[in-house]
Amino acid sequence: MRKLALRDEILLQIDKAARYIGGEVNAVMKNKDDVDIRFAMAFPDVYEIGMSNLGMMILYDMFNKRDDVWCERLFSPWTDLDKIMREEKIPLFTLESQDPVKEFDFLGITLGYEMCYTNVLQLLDLSGIPFRAAERVEDDPLVIGGGACAYNPEPLAEFFDLFYIGEGETVYGALFDAYKANKKAGGSRQDFLLKAAQIPGIYVPSLYEVTYKEDGTIESFRSKHADVPEKVEKQLIIDMDRDYNKLEAPVVPHIKATQDRVTLEIQRGCIRGCRFCQAGMIYRPTRERDVETLKESARIMLKNTGHEEISLSSLSSSDYSQLKEIVNFLIDEFRDEAVNISLPSLRIDAFALDVMSKVQDVKKSSLTFAPEAGSQRLRNVINKGLTEEDILHGAGEAFKGGWNQVKLYFMLGLPTETEDDMKGIAHLAQKIAETYYEVVPKEQRRGKVQINVSTSFFVPKPFTPFQWAPMFREEDFIEKAKVVKNEIRSQLNQRSIRYNWHEPDVTVLEGFLARGDRRCSKVILKAYEKGALYDAWSESFRYDIWKEAFKETGVDIEFYTLRERSTDEILPWDFIDAGVTKKFLIREWEQAKAETVTPNCRQKCSGCGVLKYKGGVCCESKN
Protein backbone atom coordinates (compact mmCIF):
# COMPACT_ATOMS: atom_id res chain seq x y z
CA MET A 1 0.00 0.00 0.00
CA ARG A 2 1.25 3.49 -0.88
CA LYS A 3 2.29 5.82 1.88
CA LEU A 4 0.70 9.24 1.36
CA ALA A 5 2.95 12.28 1.35
CA LEU A 6 0.54 14.13 3.64
CA ARG A 7 -0.32 13.01 7.17
CA ASP A 8 -3.96 12.43 8.08
CA GLU A 9 -4.05 15.52 10.29
CA ILE A 10 -2.97 17.65 7.33
CA LEU A 11 -5.56 16.07 5.03
CA LEU A 12 -8.24 16.86 7.60
CA GLN A 13 -7.18 20.52 7.77
CA ILE A 14 -7.22 21.36 4.07
CA ASP A 15 -9.96 21.97 1.52
CA LYS A 16 -10.66 19.10 -0.90
CA ALA A 17 -8.00 16.73 0.36
CA ALA A 18 -8.87 14.30 -2.45
CA ARG A 19 -6.90 16.59 -4.77
CA TYR A 20 -3.66 15.24 -3.33
CA ILE A 21 -4.06 11.51 -2.64
CA GLY A 22 -4.08 9.95 -6.13
CA GLY A 23 -5.31 6.38 -6.61
CA GLU A 24 -8.12 7.34 -9.00
CA VAL A 25 -9.76 4.94 -11.43
CA ASN A 26 -7.44 4.47 -14.45
CA ALA A 27 -4.43 6.10 -12.76
CA VAL A 28 -1.28 4.28 -13.89
CA MET A 29 0.89 2.55 -11.31
CA LYS A 30 4.31 1.11 -12.11
CA ASN A 31 7.40 -0.03 -10.25
CA LYS A 32 9.86 2.84 -10.37
CA ASP A 33 12.76 0.37 -10.43
CA ASP A 34 11.49 -1.07 -13.72
CA VAL A 35 11.58 2.17 -15.73
CA ASP A 36 14.40 4.26 -17.17
CA ILE A 37 12.62 7.62 -17.08
CA ARG A 38 10.39 9.16 -14.44
CA PHE A 39 8.33 12.05 -15.77
CA ALA A 40 6.37 14.35 -13.46
CA MET A 41 3.59 15.97 -15.51
CA ALA A 42 2.39 19.18 -13.88
CA PHE A 43 -0.50 21.54 -14.45
CA PRO A 44 -0.04 25.00 -12.89
CA ASP A 45 -3.53 25.24 -11.43
CA VAL A 46 -5.75 23.23 -9.11
CA TYR A 47 -6.57 19.56 -9.62
CA GLU A 48 -10.11 20.14 -10.88
CA ILE A 49 -8.94 22.36 -13.73
CA GLY A 50 -5.88 20.33 -14.65
CA MET A 51 -7.85 17.09 -14.75
CA SER A 52 -10.08 18.71 -17.38
CA ASN A 53 -7.13 19.33 -19.73
CA LEU A 54 -7.35 16.95 -22.69
CA GLY A 55 -3.77 17.51 -23.84
CA MET A 56 -2.42 16.52 -20.45
CA MET A 57 -4.52 13.35 -20.40
CA ILE A 58 -3.41 12.36 -23.91
CA LEU A 59 0.28 12.74 -23.05
CA TYR A 60 -0.13 10.99 -19.70
CA ASP A 61 -1.68 8.01 -21.45
CA MET A 62 0.87 8.04 -24.29
CA PHE A 63 3.93 8.25 -22.06
CA ASN A 64 2.72 5.41 -19.86
CA LYS A 65 2.27 3.14 -22.87
CA ARG A 66 6.07 3.06 -22.97
CA ASP A 67 7.47 0.35 -20.71
CA ASP A 68 10.54 2.46 -19.98
CA VAL A 69 8.64 5.56 -18.79
CA TRP A 70 6.46 6.20 -15.78
CA CYS A 71 4.52 9.43 -16.07
CA GLU A 72 2.87 10.76 -12.92
CA ARG A 73 0.70 13.81 -12.30
CA LEU A 74 0.81 16.81 -10.02
CA PHE A 75 -1.07 20.08 -9.75
CA SER A 76 -0.62 23.38 -7.97
CA PRO A 77 -1.47 23.01 -4.28
CA TRP A 78 -4.18 25.41 -3.17
CA THR A 79 -3.10 28.20 -0.84
CA ASP A 80 -4.04 26.32 2.35
CA LEU A 81 -1.75 23.38 1.57
CA ASP A 82 0.90 25.67 0.09
CA LYS A 83 1.21 27.37 3.50
CA ILE A 84 1.48 24.07 5.38
CA MET A 85 4.05 22.63 2.97
CA ARG A 86 6.28 25.66 3.46
CA GLU A 87 5.90 25.65 7.23
CA GLU A 88 6.62 21.93 7.55
CA LYS A 89 9.11 21.78 4.67
CA ILE A 90 7.11 19.12 2.81
CA PRO A 91 8.40 18.83 -0.79
CA LEU A 92 5.96 18.86 -3.69
CA PHE A 93 5.03 15.32 -4.73
CA THR A 94 3.28 13.42 -7.50
CA LEU A 95 -0.10 11.74 -7.06
CA GLU A 96 0.78 8.22 -8.18
CA SER A 97 3.87 7.35 -6.14
CA GLN A 98 3.62 10.30 -3.72
CA ASP A 99 7.38 10.73 -4.28
CA PRO A 100 9.04 14.17 -4.26
CA VAL A 101 9.26 15.81 -7.69
CA LYS A 102 12.95 16.43 -7.06
CA GLU A 103 13.57 12.69 -7.56
CA PHE A 104 12.27 12.69 -11.15
CA ASP A 105 14.16 12.95 -14.43
CA PHE A 106 11.72 15.45 -15.98
CA LEU A 107 9.24 17.99 -14.71
CA GLY A 108 6.87 18.79 -17.58
CA ILE A 109 4.60 21.81 -17.17
CA THR A 110 1.55 22.51 -19.33
CA LEU A 111 1.43 26.16 -20.41
CA GLY A 112 -2.11 26.96 -21.48
CA TYR A 113 -2.74 30.40 -19.99
CA GLU A 114 -0.42 33.29 -19.26
CA MET A 115 -2.06 34.07 -15.94
CA CYS A 116 -0.73 30.79 -14.52
CA TYR A 117 2.92 31.84 -14.82
CA THR A 118 3.37 32.56 -11.11
CA ASN A 119 1.99 29.08 -10.42
CA VAL A 120 4.82 27.72 -12.57
CA LEU A 121 7.23 29.29 -10.09
CA GLN A 122 5.23 27.82 -7.21
CA LEU A 123 5.74 24.33 -8.67
CA LEU A 124 9.49 24.90 -8.90
CA ASP A 125 9.69 26.50 -5.47
CA LEU A 126 7.82 23.77 -3.60
CA SER A 127 9.80 21.11 -5.48
CA GLY A 128 13.10 22.57 -4.33
CA ILE A 129 14.20 23.20 -7.92
CA PRO A 130 16.10 26.47 -8.54
CA PHE A 131 13.99 29.02 -10.41
CA ARG A 132 16.64 29.74 -13.03
CA ALA A 133 17.71 26.95 -15.37
CA ALA A 134 21.28 28.29 -15.25
CA GLU A 135 21.45 27.54 -11.51
CA ARG A 136 20.36 23.89 -11.71
CA VAL A 137 22.77 21.02 -11.18
CA GLU A 138 23.08 17.53 -12.65
CA ASP A 139 20.62 15.89 -10.25
CA ASP A 140 17.84 18.44 -10.73
CA PRO A 141 14.91 17.40 -12.95
CA LEU A 142 14.94 18.80 -16.47
CA VAL A 143 12.11 21.33 -16.65
CA ILE A 144 10.22 21.25 -19.95
CA GLY A 145 7.21 23.31 -21.02
CA GLY A 146 4.66 22.88 -23.77
CA GLY A 147 1.22 24.03 -24.84
CA ALA A 148 -0.24 27.10 -26.52
CA CYS A 149 1.82 29.58 -24.46
CA ALA A 150 5.03 27.86 -25.57
CA TYR A 151 4.55 29.60 -28.93
CA ASN A 152 6.05 32.58 -27.13
CA PRO A 153 8.23 30.95 -24.48
CA GLU A 154 10.45 33.99 -23.95
CA PRO A 155 8.89 35.46 -20.77
CA LEU A 156 9.54 32.06 -19.15
CA ALA A 157 12.81 31.24 -20.94
CA GLU A 158 14.93 31.80 -17.84
CA PHE A 159 12.93 29.24 -15.84
CA PHE A 160 12.86 26.33 -18.31
CA ASP A 161 15.59 24.00 -19.53
CA LEU A 162 13.66 23.30 -22.72
CA PHE A 163 10.30 23.66 -24.44
CA TYR A 164 8.52 21.59 -27.02
CA ILE A 165 6.76 23.49 -29.78
CA GLY A 166 3.76 21.75 -31.29
CA GLU A 167 1.93 18.53 -30.58
CA GLY A 168 3.55 16.24 -28.05
CA GLU A 169 2.67 13.03 -29.88
CA THR A 170 5.53 13.69 -32.29
CA VAL A 171 8.23 15.11 -30.03
CA TYR A 172 8.57 13.09 -26.89
CA GLY A 173 9.53 9.70 -28.30
CA ALA A 174 12.75 11.09 -29.77
CA LEU A 175 13.38 13.16 -26.65
CA PHE A 176 13.11 10.16 -24.33
CA ASP A 177 15.34 8.07 -26.57
CA ALA A 178 17.96 10.84 -26.61
CA TYR A 179 17.81 11.11 -22.82
CA LYS A 180 18.33 7.38 -22.36
CA ALA A 181 21.22 7.33 -24.84
CA ASN A 182 22.90 10.28 -23.13
CA LYS A 183 22.48 8.67 -19.72
CA LYS A 184 23.91 5.37 -20.96
CA ALA A 185 26.91 7.17 -22.46
CA GLY A 186 27.55 9.01 -19.20
CA GLY A 187 26.77 12.38 -20.75
CA SER A 188 26.13 15.51 -18.74
CA ARG A 189 22.98 17.62 -18.43
CA GLN A 190 24.46 20.08 -20.93
CA ASP A 191 25.31 17.25 -23.36
CA PHE A 192 21.68 16.18 -23.33
CA LEU A 193 20.37 19.71 -23.86
CA LEU A 194 22.63 20.14 -26.88
CA LYS A 195 21.34 16.88 -28.35
CA ALA A 196 17.75 17.79 -27.50
CA ALA A 197 18.05 21.14 -29.29
CA GLN A 198 18.72 19.24 -32.51
CA ILE A 199 15.41 17.37 -32.27
CA PRO A 200 12.76 19.12 -34.42
CA GLY A 201 10.36 21.08 -32.23
CA ILE A 202 12.63 21.32 -29.19
CA TYR A 203 13.78 24.75 -28.02
CA VAL A 204 16.57 25.12 -25.45
CA PRO A 205 16.67 28.81 -24.41
CA SER A 206 20.19 28.67 -22.98
CA LEU A 207 21.55 27.83 -26.43
CA TYR A 208 20.24 31.08 -27.97
CA GLU A 209 21.34 34.66 -27.47
CA VAL A 210 19.22 37.82 -27.67
CA THR A 211 20.47 41.39 -28.06
CA TYR A 212 18.44 44.60 -27.87
CA LYS A 213 18.51 48.02 -29.51
CA GLU A 214 18.56 51.28 -27.57
CA ASP A 215 14.83 51.72 -28.16
CA GLY A 216 14.14 48.39 -26.40
CA THR A 217 13.25 46.36 -29.48
CA ILE A 218 15.14 43.19 -30.38
CA GLU A 219 18.30 43.66 -32.41
CA SER A 220 19.18 39.99 -32.96
CA PHE A 221 18.20 36.48 -31.94
CA ARG A 222 20.64 33.70 -32.83
CA SER A 223 21.77 30.26 -31.75
CA LYS A 224 25.09 30.00 -29.91
CA HIS A 225 26.07 26.63 -31.38
CA ALA A 226 26.61 25.52 -34.97
CA ASP A 227 24.53 22.36 -34.44
CA VAL A 228 21.55 24.27 -33.04
CA PRO A 229 19.05 25.47 -35.69
CA GLU A 230 18.20 29.16 -36.00
CA LYS A 231 14.51 28.27 -36.42
CA VAL A 232 12.48 25.90 -34.26
CA GLU A 233 9.74 24.21 -36.29
CA LYS A 234 6.44 23.23 -34.69
CA GLN A 235 5.66 19.53 -34.83
CA LEU A 236 2.27 18.04 -35.54
CA ILE A 237 0.54 14.85 -36.61
CA ILE A 238 -1.26 14.89 -39.94
CA ASP A 239 -3.11 11.55 -39.90
CA MET A 240 -5.44 11.85 -36.91
CA ASP A 241 -6.47 8.20 -37.17
CA ARG A 242 -3.11 6.53 -37.75
CA ASP A 243 -0.88 8.70 -35.55
CA TYR A 244 -3.32 9.96 -32.91
CA ASN A 245 -2.82 8.53 -29.43
CA LYS A 246 -6.18 6.87 -28.86
CA LEU A 247 -7.15 7.70 -25.31
CA GLU A 248 -9.23 4.78 -24.02
CA ALA A 249 -9.14 5.03 -20.24
CA PRO A 250 -8.74 8.62 -19.02
CA VAL A 251 -8.23 9.04 -15.30
CA VAL A 252 -11.52 9.59 -13.46
CA PRO A 253 -11.11 12.41 -10.90
CA HIS A 254 -11.88 11.79 -7.24
CA ILE A 255 -13.80 15.07 -7.10
CA LYS A 256 -15.88 16.89 -9.69
CA ALA A 257 -13.64 18.41 -12.33
CA THR A 258 -14.38 21.56 -14.30
CA GLN A 259 -15.07 19.38 -17.34
CA ASP A 260 -16.46 16.27 -15.67
CA ARG A 261 -17.13 14.22 -18.78
CA VAL A 262 -15.62 12.18 -21.56
CA THR A 263 -13.94 14.47 -24.07
CA LEU A 264 -13.96 13.21 -27.65
CA GLU A 265 -11.58 15.18 -29.86
CA ILE A 266 -13.20 15.21 -33.31
CA GLN A 267 -10.65 17.40 -35.09
CA ARG A 268 -7.69 19.71 -34.58
CA GLY A 269 -7.31 23.12 -36.11
CA CYS A 270 -9.92 25.38 -37.64
CA ILE A 271 -10.76 26.15 -41.27
CA ARG A 272 -11.76 29.71 -40.32
CA GLY A 273 -9.24 32.50 -40.17
CA CYS A 274 -10.38 34.73 -37.30
CA ARG A 275 -7.60 37.29 -37.07
CA PHE A 276 -7.63 37.52 -33.27
CA CYS A 277 -7.51 33.76 -32.69
CA GLN A 278 -4.14 32.24 -31.87
CA ALA A 279 -5.42 28.66 -31.73
CA GLY A 280 -6.88 28.97 -35.22
CA MET A 281 -3.44 29.88 -36.56
CA ILE A 282 -1.03 27.70 -34.59
CA TYR A 283 -3.08 24.51 -34.96
CA ARG A 284 -3.34 24.73 -38.74
CA PRO A 285 -4.03 22.75 -40.85
CA THR A 286 -7.39 21.39 -39.75
CA ARG A 287 -7.26 17.62 -39.39
CA GLU A 288 -10.38 15.52 -38.88
CA ARG A 289 -10.77 12.16 -37.18
CA ASP A 290 -12.80 9.50 -38.97
CA VAL A 291 -16.32 9.07 -37.64
CA GLU A 292 -15.95 5.30 -37.25
CA THR A 293 -12.87 5.81 -35.10
CA LEU A 294 -14.81 8.28 -32.97
CA LYS A 295 -17.69 5.85 -32.48
CA GLU A 296 -15.31 3.20 -31.18
CA SER A 297 -13.53 5.67 -28.91
CA ALA A 298 -16.83 6.90 -27.46
CA ARG A 299 -17.96 3.38 -26.58
CA ILE A 300 -14.65 2.50 -24.94
CA MET A 301 -14.20 5.72 -22.96
CA LEU A 302 -17.75 5.79 -21.60
CA LYS A 303 -17.40 2.14 -20.56
CA ASN A 304 -14.02 2.71 -18.90
CA THR A 305 -14.99 5.86 -17.01
CA GLY A 306 -18.67 5.64 -16.12
CA HIS A 307 -19.18 9.26 -17.16
CA GLU A 308 -22.71 10.33 -18.10
CA GLU A 309 -21.74 13.08 -20.51
CA ILE A 310 -19.63 13.24 -23.64
CA SER A 311 -18.28 16.43 -25.17
CA LEU A 312 -17.24 16.80 -28.80
CA SER A 313 -14.03 18.79 -28.67
CA SER A 314 -12.68 21.04 -31.41
CA LEU A 315 -12.15 24.71 -32.16
CA SER A 316 -15.25 24.78 -34.36
CA SER A 317 -17.47 21.71 -33.98
CA SER A 318 -19.87 22.91 -36.68
CA ASP A 319 -17.13 22.63 -39.30
CA TYR A 320 -16.51 18.93 -38.65
CA SER A 321 -17.71 17.33 -41.89
CA GLN A 322 -19.35 14.31 -40.20
CA LEU A 323 -20.93 16.15 -37.28
CA LYS A 324 -24.50 15.00 -37.90
CA GLU A 325 -23.47 11.37 -38.17
CA ILE A 326 -21.48 11.31 -34.94
CA VAL A 327 -24.17 13.21 -33.01
CA ASN A 328 -26.93 10.91 -34.28
CA PHE A 329 -24.84 7.88 -33.37
CA LEU A 330 -24.11 9.11 -29.85
CA ILE A 331 -27.75 9.94 -29.14
CA ASP A 332 -29.06 6.63 -30.49
CA GLU A 333 -26.30 4.48 -29.01
CA PHE A 334 -26.48 5.87 -25.48
CA ARG A 335 -30.11 6.97 -25.20
CA ASP A 336 -30.93 4.28 -22.63
CA GLU A 337 -28.02 5.40 -20.44
CA ALA A 338 -29.23 9.03 -20.67
CA VAL A 339 -25.79 10.20 -21.74
CA ASN A 340 -25.80 13.93 -22.35
CA ILE A 341 -24.13 15.25 -25.51
CA SER A 342 -22.22 18.53 -25.24
CA LEU A 343 -21.50 20.51 -28.40
CA PRO A 344 -19.20 23.43 -27.60
CA SER A 345 -17.61 25.75 -30.17
CA LEU A 346 -20.60 26.05 -32.47
CA ARG A 347 -20.93 28.68 -35.16
CA ILE A 348 -24.31 30.31 -35.13
CA ASP A 349 -24.58 30.08 -38.92
CA ALA A 350 -23.91 26.35 -39.08
CA PHE A 351 -25.92 24.84 -36.27
CA ALA A 352 -28.36 22.43 -37.93
CA LEU A 353 -31.85 22.39 -36.41
CA ASP A 354 -32.20 18.61 -36.58
CA VAL A 355 -28.94 18.06 -34.68
CA MET A 356 -29.86 20.75 -32.18
CA SER A 357 -33.30 19.29 -31.52
CA LYS A 358 -31.92 15.80 -30.96
CA VAL A 359 -29.39 17.05 -28.45
CA GLN A 360 -32.17 18.90 -26.65
CA ASP A 361 -34.19 15.68 -26.39
CA VAL A 362 -31.56 14.35 -24.02
CA LYS A 363 -31.01 17.46 -21.90
CA LYS A 364 -32.03 21.09 -22.29
CA SER A 365 -29.44 23.79 -21.71
CA SER A 366 -28.57 27.26 -22.93
CA LEU A 367 -26.80 27.77 -26.23
CA THR A 368 -23.55 29.67 -26.51
CA PHE A 369 -22.57 31.63 -29.60
CA ALA A 370 -19.68 34.00 -30.24
CA PRO A 371 -20.39 36.78 -32.76
CA GLU A 372 -17.29 38.53 -31.25
CA ALA A 373 -18.23 41.97 -32.63
CA GLY A 374 -21.46 43.94 -32.67
CA SER A 375 -21.23 45.41 -36.17
CA GLN A 376 -20.74 43.88 -39.58
CA ARG A 377 -17.85 46.23 -40.26
CA LEU A 378 -15.91 45.01 -37.25
CA ARG A 379 -16.79 41.36 -37.95
CA ASN A 380 -15.19 41.87 -41.34
CA VAL A 381 -12.11 43.38 -39.70
CA ILE A 382 -11.64 40.30 -37.52
CA ASN A 383 -12.61 37.96 -40.39
CA LYS A 384 -15.41 36.34 -38.42
CA GLY A 385 -17.25 35.51 -41.61
CA LEU A 386 -20.70 36.02 -40.09
CA THR A 387 -23.40 38.37 -41.30
CA GLU A 388 -26.17 39.75 -39.12
CA GLU A 389 -28.60 37.77 -41.25
CA ASP A 390 -26.67 34.58 -40.44
CA ILE A 391 -26.76 35.35 -36.73
CA LEU A 392 -30.47 36.17 -36.57
CA HIS A 393 -31.38 33.17 -38.73
CA GLY A 394 -29.30 30.86 -36.55
CA ALA A 395 -30.81 32.26 -33.37
CA GLY A 396 -34.27 31.89 -34.84
CA GLU A 397 -33.64 28.24 -35.69
CA ALA A 398 -32.42 27.70 -32.13
CA PHE A 399 -35.55 29.31 -30.68
CA LYS A 400 -37.76 27.16 -32.91
CA GLY A 401 -35.87 24.15 -31.59
CA GLY A 402 -37.02 24.93 -28.06
CA TRP A 403 -34.30 27.11 -26.60
CA ASN A 404 -35.05 30.36 -24.84
CA GLN A 405 -31.62 31.05 -23.33
CA VAL A 406 -28.69 32.25 -25.39
CA LYS A 407 -25.20 33.28 -24.30
CA LEU A 408 -23.41 35.75 -26.56
CA TYR A 409 -19.68 36.41 -26.39
CA PHE A 410 -18.08 39.59 -27.72
CA MET A 411 -14.72 41.34 -27.49
CA LEU A 412 -14.07 44.99 -26.77
CA GLY A 413 -10.93 46.84 -27.78
CA LEU A 414 -10.49 45.18 -31.16
CA PRO A 415 -8.39 47.00 -33.77
CA THR A 416 -10.26 49.87 -35.54
CA GLU A 417 -13.19 49.66 -33.06
CA THR A 418 -15.52 52.69 -32.88
CA GLU A 419 -18.31 53.66 -30.49
CA ASP A 420 -20.86 52.50 -33.06
CA ASP A 421 -19.25 49.06 -33.01
CA MET A 422 -19.59 48.93 -29.22
CA LYS A 423 -23.22 50.03 -29.29
CA GLY A 424 -23.82 47.42 -31.98
CA ILE A 425 -23.43 44.72 -29.31
CA ALA A 426 -26.55 46.02 -27.53
CA HIS A 427 -28.43 46.42 -30.80
CA LEU A 428 -27.63 42.85 -31.89
CA ALA A 429 -28.76 41.46 -28.53
CA GLN A 430 -32.01 43.41 -28.88
CA LYS A 431 -32.60 42.02 -32.39
CA ILE A 432 -32.00 38.47 -31.15
CA ALA A 433 -34.53 39.01 -28.36
CA GLU A 434 -37.03 40.35 -30.90
CA THR A 435 -36.43 37.30 -33.09
CA TYR A 436 -37.54 35.01 -30.26
CA TYR A 437 -40.94 36.69 -30.00
CA GLU A 438 -41.30 36.79 -33.79
CA VAL A 439 -40.60 33.11 -34.52
CA VAL A 440 -41.99 31.35 -31.43
CA PRO A 441 -45.80 31.40 -31.04
CA LYS A 442 -46.95 32.61 -27.63
CA GLU A 443 -48.44 29.24 -26.66
CA GLN A 444 -45.12 27.48 -27.39
CA ARG A 445 -42.84 29.80 -25.43
CA ARG A 446 -41.01 28.39 -22.42
CA GLY A 447 -41.06 31.66 -20.53
CA LYS A 448 -39.26 34.84 -21.49
CA VAL A 449 -36.19 34.87 -23.65
CA GLN A 450 -32.93 35.35 -21.77
CA ILE A 451 -29.93 36.84 -23.58
CA ASN A 452 -26.70 36.78 -21.57
CA VAL A 453 -24.13 39.12 -23.10
CA SER A 454 -20.53 38.77 -22.00
CA THR A 455 -17.61 40.87 -23.19
CA SER A 456 -13.94 40.18 -22.74
CA PHE A 457 -11.21 42.63 -23.66
CA PHE A 458 -9.03 41.97 -26.68
CA VAL A 459 -5.51 40.64 -26.10
CA PRO A 460 -3.19 40.51 -29.15
CA LYS A 461 -1.48 37.11 -29.36
CA PRO A 462 1.63 35.83 -31.18
CA PHE A 463 1.17 34.25 -34.62
CA THR A 464 -2.03 36.13 -35.36
CA PRO A 465 -2.54 39.00 -37.81
CA PHE A 466 -3.20 41.20 -34.77
CA GLN A 467 0.17 40.45 -33.15
CA TRP A 468 1.31 43.96 -34.12
CA ALA A 469 -1.77 45.73 -32.68
CA PRO A 470 -1.75 48.00 -29.62
CA MET A 471 -3.89 47.38 -26.54
CA PHE A 472 -5.68 49.85 -24.29
CA ARG A 473 -5.20 50.92 -20.67
CA GLU A 474 -7.49 49.53 -17.95
CA GLU A 475 -9.49 52.75 -17.69
CA ASP A 476 -10.10 52.74 -21.46
CA PHE A 477 -11.46 49.20 -21.31
CA ILE A 478 -13.82 50.18 -18.49
CA GLU A 479 -15.17 53.11 -20.51
CA LYS A 480 -15.84 50.76 -23.43
CA ALA A 481 -17.78 48.40 -21.16
CA LYS A 482 -19.84 51.33 -19.87
CA VAL A 483 -20.80 52.26 -23.44
CA VAL A 484 -22.21 48.76 -23.96
CA LYS A 485 -23.92 48.71 -20.56
CA ASN A 486 -25.65 52.05 -21.10
CA GLU A 487 -26.75 51.10 -24.61
CA ILE A 488 -28.27 47.84 -23.36
CA ARG A 489 -30.24 49.80 -20.77
CA SER A 490 -31.79 51.86 -23.57
CA GLN A 491 -33.11 48.81 -25.44
CA LEU A 492 -36.79 47.81 -25.48
CA ASN A 493 -36.02 44.30 -24.21
CA GLN A 494 -33.42 45.38 -21.67
CA ARG A 495 -34.91 43.14 -18.97
CA SER A 496 -34.21 40.12 -21.15
CA ILE A 497 -30.57 41.11 -21.64
CA ARG A 498 -27.98 40.57 -18.92
CA TYR A 499 -24.49 41.95 -19.26
CA ASN A 500 -21.14 41.22 -17.64
CA TRP A 501 -17.55 41.92 -18.56
CA HIS A 502 -14.05 40.63 -17.81
CA GLU A 503 -11.72 42.45 -15.44
CA PRO A 504 -9.51 44.89 -17.40
CA ASP A 505 -6.42 44.72 -15.16
CA VAL A 506 -6.14 40.96 -15.74
CA THR A 507 -6.45 41.60 -19.47
CA VAL A 508 -3.64 44.15 -19.53
CA LEU A 509 -1.31 41.85 -17.60
CA GLU A 510 -2.19 38.96 -19.91
CA GLY A 511 -1.28 41.18 -22.86
CA PHE A 512 2.09 41.96 -21.29
CA LEU A 513 2.88 38.29 -20.71
CA ALA A 514 1.55 37.14 -24.10
CA ARG A 515 3.91 39.34 -26.14
CA GLY A 516 6.76 39.65 -23.67
CA ASP A 517 10.44 38.88 -24.13
CA ARG A 518 13.15 37.49 -21.85
CA ARG A 519 13.31 40.70 -19.84
CA CYS A 520 9.81 39.99 -18.54
CA SER A 521 10.99 37.03 -16.47
CA LYS A 522 12.30 39.31 -13.72
CA VAL A 523 8.85 40.87 -13.35
CA ILE A 524 7.21 37.44 -13.01
CA LEU A 525 9.78 36.35 -10.43
CA LYS A 526 9.51 39.59 -8.46
CA ALA A 527 5.70 39.39 -8.42
CA TYR A 528 5.87 35.79 -7.19
CA GLU A 529 8.36 36.70 -4.47
CA LYS A 530 6.00 39.47 -3.32
CA GLY A 531 3.06 37.06 -3.07
CA ALA A 532 1.44 36.81 -6.53
CA LEU A 533 -0.16 33.39 -7.02
CA TYR A 534 -3.27 32.03 -8.70
CA ASP A 535 -3.53 35.14 -10.85
CA ALA A 536 -6.14 33.40 -13.00
CA TRP A 537 -8.50 33.41 -10.00
CA SER A 538 -10.28 36.72 -9.42
CA GLU A 539 -10.32 36.22 -5.64
CA SER A 540 -6.54 35.73 -5.61
CA PHE A 541 -5.40 38.23 -8.23
CA ARG A 542 -3.47 41.18 -6.76
CA TYR A 543 -2.70 43.75 -9.43
CA ASP A 544 -1.11 45.99 -6.81
CA ILE A 545 1.62 43.37 -6.36
CA TRP A 546 2.31 43.35 -10.08
CA LYS A 547 2.47 47.14 -10.18
CA GLU A 548 5.09 47.03 -7.45
CA ALA A 549 7.00 44.37 -9.39
CA PHE A 550 7.08 46.55 -12.51
CA LYS A 551 8.27 49.51 -10.49
CA GLU A 552 11.01 47.59 -8.67
CA THR A 553 12.34 45.88 -11.82
CA GLY A 554 12.17 49.00 -13.98
CA VAL A 555 10.16 47.26 -16.70
CA ASP A 556 7.65 49.46 -18.53
CA ILE A 557 4.45 47.49 -19.10
CA GLU A 558 3.21 50.00 -21.68
CA PHE A 559 6.19 49.23 -23.93
CA TYR A 560 4.64 45.78 -24.35
CA THR A 561 0.94 46.65 -24.30
CA LEU A 562 0.22 50.09 -25.80
CA ARG A 563 2.81 50.11 -28.56
CA GLU A 564 1.86 49.18 -32.15
CA ARG A 565 4.68 47.09 -33.56
CA SER A 566 6.21 47.67 -36.96
CA THR A 567 5.96 44.68 -39.29
CA ASP A 568 9.73 45.03 -39.75
CA GLU A 569 10.41 44.56 -36.04
CA ILE A 570 11.96 41.32 -34.80
CA LEU A 571 9.36 39.84 -32.47
CA PRO A 572 10.35 37.64 -29.50
CA TRP A 573 8.72 34.58 -31.09
CA ASP A 574 9.97 35.07 -34.64
CA PHE A 575 12.48 32.21 -34.24
CA ILE A 576 9.56 29.74 -34.17
CA ASP A 577 8.13 28.36 -37.41
CA ALA A 578 4.46 27.81 -36.55
CA GLY A 579 3.48 26.93 -40.12
CA VAL A 580 1.72 30.18 -40.96
CA THR A 581 4.22 32.56 -42.56
CA LYS A 582 4.94 36.11 -41.45
CA LYS A 583 4.17 37.21 -45.01
CA PHE A 584 0.66 35.78 -44.65
CA LEU A 585 0.12 37.40 -41.25
CA ILE A 586 1.22 40.79 -42.57
CA ARG A 587 -1.15 40.43 -45.51
CA GLU A 588 -4.01 39.57 -43.14
CA TRP A 589 -3.13 42.56 -40.93
CA GLU A 590 -3.47 44.77 -44.00
CA GLN A 591 -6.70 43.03 -45.03
CA ALA A 592 -8.10 43.72 -41.56
CA LYS A 593 -7.45 47.43 -41.91
CA ALA A 594 -9.13 47.30 -45.32
CA GLU A 595 -12.14 45.48 -43.76
CA THR A 596 -11.71 42.64 -46.25
CA VAL A 597 -12.84 39.08 -45.52
CA THR A 598 -10.57 36.12 -46.34
CA PRO A 599 -12.39 32.89 -47.38
CA ASN A 600 -12.08 29.81 -45.18
CA CYS A 601 -9.84 26.85 -46.02
CA ARG A 602 -12.59 24.85 -47.72
CA GLN A 603 -13.47 27.74 -50.02
CA LYS A 604 -10.12 29.04 -51.22
CA CYS A 605 -6.48 28.74 -50.26
CA SER A 606 -5.27 31.91 -48.54
CA GLY A 607 -1.61 30.97 -48.95
CA CYS A 608 -0.97 30.82 -45.21
CA GLY A 609 1.99 28.47 -45.54
CA VAL A 610 0.72 25.19 -44.08
CA LEU A 611 0.55 23.49 -47.47
CA LYS A 612 4.06 22.27 -46.67
CA TYR A 613 2.58 19.75 -44.23
CA LYS A 614 0.89 18.00 -47.19
CA GLY A 615 -2.31 17.10 -45.44
CA GLY A 616 -5.33 18.26 -43.51
CA VAL A 617 -8.32 20.24 -44.72
CA CYS A 618 -6.96 22.52 -47.43
CA CYS A 619 -8.60 23.01 -50.80
CA GLU A 620 -5.21 23.33 -52.55
CA SER A 621 -3.77 20.13 -51.06
CA LYS A 622 -6.43 18.11 -52.86
CA ASN A 623 -5.60 19.40 -56.33
Predicted regions and their residues:
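Radical SAM enzyme core and accessory elements
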Residues: 1-28, 33, 39-41, 490-623
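Flexible loop/turn segments at secondary-structure boundaries
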Residues: 47-50, 79-82, 115-117, 150-153, ...
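Conserved SAM/AdoMet-binding glycine-rich loop
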Residues: 41-46, 115, 299-407, 412-452, ...
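Low-complexity, highly charged intrinsically disordered N-terminal segments
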Residues: 39-44, 50-72, 77-85, 89, ...
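Glycine-rich beta-alpha loop elements in corrinoid/cobalamin-binding modules
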Residues: 76-222, 465-517, 524-539
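N-terminal [4Fe-4S]-dependent radical SAM core
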Residues: 10-40, 47-48, 205, 211-263, ...
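Canonical Radical SAM [4Fe-4S] cluster-binding loop centered on the CxxxCxxC motif
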Residues: 53, 255-292, 607-622
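N-terminal pre-triad scaffold of radical SAM enzymes
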Residues: 41-45, 63, 251-278, 302, ...
